[in-house]
A protein has these predicted regions:
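Short acidic active-site motifs
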Residues: 82-83, 106-108, 127
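Structural alpha-helical scaffold elements that stabilize or flank donor/cofactor-binding regions
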Residues: 111-112, 131
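Short beta->alpha connector loops at strand-helix junctions that form conserved
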Residues: 10, 36-37, 122, 139-146
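Structured adenosyl-cofactor binding patch, chiefly the S-adenosyl-L-methionine
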Residues: 129-168
Length: 168
């Protein structure tokens, strides 16, 4: 049995991280990506950004996405709660986030049969307080070295691998 996974990318700063996450998302069969806050996103129909800026951002994302920016459905929201509400309406019933937190559980111990929305956050500050308060679970990747954090795109790829292998 497999579950469907969508991603929520909130307040991620780097176009390279967004592109890399999109590429990993495509590899692991992510169904939809929800962009919120100031996360850069690919070109959209009726884009309200300045045309030269939207094209520049799209080009930077495309460098690391390698085509995934055109293969995964996505939508853009100003606010996290609106993105989560849209995901719920689309059938994603379990809202989880990836973060180091005293309340977190190891990602390899997490198990669900529900389609889920995985939130990842800002490169420096992680996911928002709102996300931590509203997530059904806070998941953490075990680390054993001296560094206490992973790049958001690397962490997302590891999380997607773990979550897609819950039900191989």
């Amino acid at each position: 049995m497999s579950i469907n996974i969508s991603l929520l990318l909130h307040d991620i700063r780097s176009t390279q991280n967004v592109g890399s996450i999109m590429r990993s998302a495509d590899c692991f069969g992510v169904k939809h990506i929800y962009f919120s806050g100031y996360t850069p996103y690919p070109l959209i129909q009726n884009d309200t950004r300045l045309p030269h800026l939207a094209k520049k951002i799209n080009s930077r994302i495309a460098k690391t996405a390698l085509g995934a920016e055109t293969s995964i459905p996505f939508s853009v929201y100003n606010y996290e709660p609106d993105a989560v509400s849209a995901a719920n309406k689309a059938g994603f019933k379990q809202f989880v986030c990836l973060e180091q937190d005293p309340a977190s559980i190891p990602i390899n111990k997490y198990n669900t049969n529900l389609d889920l929305l995985l939130a990842v956050g800002n490169e420096l500050n992680g996911v928002s307080f709102w996300t931590r308060q509203n997530a059904h679970a806070i998941l953490e990747i075990a680390q054993f070295g001296k560094k206490e954090s992973l790049n958001v795109s690397n962490a997302t790829a590891i999380a997607l691998y773990a979550l897609t292998n819950m039900h191989p």
